[in-house]
Amino acid sequence: MLAIVPGALSQDDLARIYSEAQQAQAAGDLQTATNKYEAIVRLRPQMAEAYANLGNLYYQQGQADRAKAAYRKAIQIKPELGGPYFFLGVIAFGEHDYPAALRHLQRAQALQPPNVLIHSYLGYTHYARSAFREAAGELEKAAALDGTDIDVLYHLSKSYGHLARDSYAELQSQFSDSAYTILARAHLHESREDWKAASEQYRLALEKMPDNRRLREKLQWTQARAAGAPASNPGTNDELIDASLMYRDSSPSGPKLKEEMVRSQSKLRELLQGAKSDKSVYLIAETYQVLSFLTSLAVFETDPDSYRAHQLRAQLLEESKNDEGAIVEYRNVLKRKPDLQNIHFAIGSLYWKEQHFEEARPELEAELKINPNHPQALYELGDLSAFTGETQIAEKYFLEALKLEPGMVEAHFALEKIYTQNGRFEKSLEHLQKALHANASDPTAHYRLALVYRKLGRNQDADRELAIFSQKQAAPK
């Protein structure tokens, strides 16, 4: 076979091989394209773009390690190339290495003009780290560039939902006796159609805002519904009093939906920049809730039969305690996207909570085939194994869960129970101390420490832990 000498390769020869590689790639012949690019980088080892293209081919074929090596070589030669940083970020995201994903994606963002994919993956990465404010910011930018991407819209809706819950928690914590806190509770009960509880909260809110006409209308309406009357919601919606329930009876669609989303986003930015008060925190929470709802409507409007639309329906059914309906919808998700993470887990977890262990196990195991690094699935499989007396298997699952999530208190408690039953008290103490470190406010660890110390004959230590337990139990929540 005739060997090609690197120095003898003409520009025309190189162009020909490049053309052949591109033709093979366009035809879907990834192996031939890969072989061509491998030849090119051997002959021109300083050609950064060829390494980047080779990395793309490895990535398309699921060869992540080879792709990473090619991308790193590309940016070593030419640091201003943005593409390799993006794909390194995507690979790191898939490997759950979120710090590396952020680092690479932010570098790609700095090197390239606004790009929907970079904003999307930055949003997904922030979301995976529970940095929901940052996630929403990136996903808003992605949605502005492409308002039809259901994955972007789904994660944006969920980010807004998490931010709403965080803001409601802040409202309750800092302004527990405020009329706005009471009003937020009324909205929660009304959304669940718990008319008696809703009317009671509206009554309490009206005591603090006795001159508010709309609040009085809401009280009378919920009282009528609590009494069984088929009363329609009277009056005109008030943005302050109705807030997150503004669209309960009439949902916007088409251009009006986009207009309302933009208006709510603008309103939210103003609220976040203003001074903090009970009213502002209430409005922030309610506006996040509105945005979560509107963005979910955008998912349904974009593709009502998409896997994300069915996933949102499943989650709504789960929140309303309709587990059977939720499972049906989760299975509809799997019909459309069998490899979507967290769906088998959602089904298995619903079965697990109801102690339907035979149905739960195969779902949780299926989740681990898709995502072996799912700490909660590992924990629940450990719990199933412990329940059936398979303590060695349970121990293995719990330890694997803790490798991924060292602060999982439930797994530490589960291991303590196994070790205590087996007389391995030092291991019991180790995991109780770790549970205490993970959540110092929980008195349970102190009580269980006292029991283990008592078994070891360390009565003074046991008395101390019981005293701490009693003190924490008596502390105001």
What are these regions (language model features)?
Residues D13-L43, N56, Q60, H187-L188, ...:
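Alpha-helical segment of the N-proximal tetratricopeptide repeat
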